[in-house]
Amino acid sequence: MNDLKSLKSELTSKTVEELFKHLNLLKKELFNLRFQQTLGELKNTSRFSLVKKSIARIKTELTKRSSSGE
């Protein structure tokens, strides 16, 4: 629970540019995970859900900011 709160506070403290950079990094990581899975090299499949949830959290924060006008 504390991890989630610290993650939320970390996201709210970042600028929009930093959020977009982090989002792009996570998208690249997700692509690499899919590539590794196709090749049969992926050991930790739970990383998929963690990366996808992080992407969703960042997108939610960006949407929240765009609707509030920041």
From Swiss-Prot:
GO cellular component: cytosolic large ribosomal subunit
Transmembrane segments: none
Gene Ontology molecular function, alphabetical: structural constituent of ribosome
Stored InterPro entries: Ribosomal_protein_uL29, Ribosomal_uL29, Ribosomal_uL29_CS, Ribosomal_uL29_sf
A GO BP annotation: translation
Pfam families (UniProt xref): Ribosomal_L29
Keywords of this entry: Ribonucleoprotein, Ribosomal protein
Sequence similarity: Belongs to the universal ribosomal protein uL29 family.
Protein name as it appears in the record: Large ribosomal subunit protein uL29
Species whose genome carries this gene: Rickettsia bellii (strain OSU 85-389)
Gene: rpmC
